[in-house]
Design a protein with these regions (language model features):
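ATP-binding pocket architecture of kinase catalytic cores
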Residues: 27-182, 190-197
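Juxta-kinase regulatory segment immediately upstream of eukaryotic protein kinase catalytic domains
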Residues: 1-21
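Short secondary-structure junctions
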Residues: 20-28
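Catalytic-loop of the protein kinase fold
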Residues: 200-202, 207
Length: 214
């Protein structure tokens, strides 16, 4: 974390909210592969617990900040528990890099090394987990948000996605994977039918992406 970040952030946030705040705590959250993430607590007339996501120069997973922001935007005030968005900025002069700001969503990620970490609530948590994924998939996405995602996207949609991910796989591969290549050839020969309804899906089910409360 940059030594200047706490002072840079409080100057920005006080101007953004038009209120005076002081920093109580800034804590780096490790584990995110796409952006540096910080838990920030500030105090003014009230105490605010915030999450700051800062774009890195290089990361294990390359994603556009705007894509993440729009995905969260699509599920504000819905049955899907997403953080309340506050701001997004591409201006590097504010905090040294582009960033997103949101309210903290309470919960914690389970450690894969802790046995029976979800016990005794694993059945209920499992139901909630799959129910939330269902809510994501069936949600009608705001037209403006959807068109931003698909703008300049060639048709059919399946080919655009397959071309994109095949390129990612080939760029990241150190050798040819015969079984994987056979699967790719099969998908091109037997493409899915074009969907009449477009929706978002969540494709990363790792435990670090699932927050739970006791």
């Amino acid at each position: 974390m940059s030594e200047e970040l706490p002072s840079q952030f409080i100057n920005y946030f006080s101007k953004f909210s038009n209120k005076e705040y002081s920093v109580v705590n800034v804590e780096r959250i490790f584990g995110g592969a796409s952006r540096e993430t910080y838990k920030i607590e500030v105090k003014g007339e009230t105490v605010e617990r915030l999450i700051l996501r800062v774009t890195q120069d290089s990361s294990l997973i390359e994603t556009e900040q705007k894509t993440e922001y729009l995905a969260y935007s699509a599920f504000q005030d819905s049955k899907v528990p997403v953080p309340v968005l506050l701001d997004m900025s591409e201006d590097k002069n504010i905090l040294g890099a582009p960033f997103m700001l949101m309210k903290e969503l309470e919960g914690e990620a389970a450690s894969p090394f802790t046995p029976d970490v979800y016990s005794p609530n694993e059945k209920e948590l499992g139901k909630q987990f799959w129910s939330i994924l269902g809510e994501i998939a069936k949600k009608e996405i705001n037209k403006d948000i959807f068109e931003t995602f698909v703008k300049d996207t060639p048709c059919p949609g399946w080919k655009n996605e397959l071309d994109k991910w095949v390129e990612v796989i080939h760029d990241d591969s150190i050798s040819t994977e015969p079984i994987l290549e056979a699967g790719i050839r099969s998908l091109y020969r037997n493409p899915p039918k074009e969907s009449k309804k477009h929706s978002m899906v969540h494709g990363d089910y790792r435990s670090g992406n699932f927050l739970y409360l006791d």
